[in-house]
Amino acid sequence: MKITITSLLFFLVMIVELASAGTLLHNGANLPSLRDNTTLTDARNVLKYLQVLGFPSNKIAATDTVGTFIIFSNRTEANTTAMTKTVSYCYRNYGHSFYFTHYKYDYFPSGISYMAKLGDATVNHTDLPHFRNNKRLTTQELNAFQHPIVEFQ
């Protein structure tokens, strides 16, 4: 079996790539925090995973008047379809306890309060507010949303 310099170089590059990916995922700063039933911990975990999965660090974390956690992506700067998949994945796995949305606009909409850029929010996460909790509806609340069936003739 003949080993060429090219195949050896490829093998070494793969080892380095795998090692750096493992370091990125197993570095204590990038591991998700243990859930403590607070929206702040869940928001930190979403932000960490967005960063680990390669979400651009210049994207904006924001909130609105009712306490929704918002990721804002300017659709003139990036492929928002790919970003939507990444954001949805992170939210489903780590942020399901709070109100959340991903805005994709050409401009920063009014009524939204800027918190930080993604890169800054993962480092200075103590500046994040608590967000509005999702909660299960009671039977009474659920019944209030149900409408009578209307038959069309």
From Swiss-Prot:
The positions making up the signal sequence are 1-21
Its keywords, alphabetically, are: Signal
Indicate yes or no for the key word Signal.
yes
Looking at the record's lineage, which domain of life comes first?
Eukaryota
Q: What is this protein called?
A: Uncharacterized protein YEL028W
